[in-house]
Amino acid sequence: MIIAIDGPAASGKGTLARRLATQLRFAYLDTGKLYRAVGMAVIKGGADPHDAKAALAAARALDPATLGDRLLSTDTAGKAASVVGAIPEVRAALLDLQRDFATHPPQGAPGAVLDGRDIGTVVCPEAEVKIFVTASVEVRAHRRLQELRSGGHDVKEDDVLRDMRERDARDSGRAVAPMAIAADAVVLDTSRMTAEQALTAALDILAHKSQKT
């Protein structure tokens, strides 16, 4: 079984996807980290994330072992990911890796959970379960603010909110694989939900899907 979890930044999709994978003993892939790793590799190489040639080279040379790098959780990595993720050649280079993970989960797992922006629409349109996780931009900005401040970053809420809106616009407006809700996806608004409530709601969605099949 393939479970596709999509949604904008700080919607809670990553936390939900990880907990869902743990609960079901499925393999888990945070596809956003692939783009963060590419973006940071470009920056470390002294290039600009907008440089398509440098970004493509980084995508082709991506080492999955680098996905545990703490720098991938920084705001800089997030912004770079949004930029390189809008480059068609980069998305194409990472597509096979994601699809192979979904169809051949590592370590004999019975299924896979992937989270990102275009899992249900482009990467795994055949996924048996698709959930689009969202929340108001204000709630998402506040979540990101708390996350950054807890990491020791001195940031202003207005700046985080502005960056969040700009990132949403980039993710939804890119020419290739824009963030969109799949026609057969269930929308889960986590604005007023705890992580535990979101997990319960997702498990209910899975149970409902199982009953229909």
UniProtKB/Swiss-Prot annotation:
Keywords: ATP-binding, Cytoplasm, Kinase, Nucleotide-binding, Transferase. It holds the Pfam family Cytidylate_kin. The lineage of its organism: Bacteria, Pseudomonadati, Pseudomonadota, Alphaproteobacteria, Rhodospirillales. NCBIfam families: cmk. This is Cytidylate kinase. It is found in: Cytoplasm. GO terms for molecular function: ATP binding; CMP kinase activity; dCMP kinase activity. ATP binds at G7, P8, A9, A10, S11, G12, K13, G14, T15. It comes from the Bacteria. Belongs to the cytidylate kinase family. Type 1 subfamily. The gene is cmk. Its EC number is 2.7.4.25.
